[in-house]
Amino acid sequence: MESEGKIVFTEEQEALVVKSWSVMKKNSAELGLKLFIKIFEIAPTTKKMFSFLRDSPIPAEQNPKLKPHAMSVFVMCCESAVQLRKTGKVTVRETTLKRLGASHSKYGVVDEHFEVAKYALLETIKEAVPEMWSPEMKVAWGQAYDHLVAAIKAEMNLSN
């Protein structure tokens, strides 16, 4: 939701996101890896989008380059969600957003890829905090993800 260019993220949504992220933060490397393994299980061809996985004989989950990448993606998604209400916008550095837009565009990321990643992210969070998970938490994380994706897509369109 947006109001005059500012994202509306309720206090309740913020509380759900902050509470769950505070529990997940310490395991962000493992959770990031789980997120990417889920993405690859749902859409195996996405592995080819990563140069370090494309021709590697090593299984993705054992690839030494995947874990740090996966962790940085997971942390960025979560930190962006936590800041959403406070700032009223996606708070990823502009240079990072530009880079994300350019790389997602270059590797042919389309709407379906973002949808797979959203599903995988929500499932990863649900499994990480099962005792906290609720329909409201799913909506909160889903909205936060959608705002991040909208910001990345805006940069993708600029880089085309």
Curated annotation (Swiss-Prot):
The organs and tissues expressing this protein are described as: Expressed in roots and rosette leaves.
Residues in Globin domain copies: 8-157
Q: What induces it?
A: By low oxygen levels but not by cold, dehydration, heat shock, wounding or oxidative stress.
GO process terms (BP): cellular response to hypoxia; response to hypoxia
| Source organism, top-level taxon | Eukaryota
UniProt main location, coarse: cytoplasm
Task: Pull one GO CC term from this UniProt entry.
Answer: nucleus
Q: Where does heme b bind?
A: 51, 65, 69, 99, 103-104
Details of cofactor binding: Binds 1 heme group per subunit.
Q: What's in the keyword line of the UniProt record?
A: Cytoplasm, Heme, Iron, Metal-binding, Nucleus, Oxidoreductase
Q: Which EC numbers characterise this protein's activity in its record?
A: 1.7.2.-
State whether it acts alone or in a complex, and with which partners, per the record.
Homodimer.
Family membership: Belongs to the plant globin family.
Name-wise, this protein is Anaerobic nitrite reductase AHB1
Primary gene name: AHB1
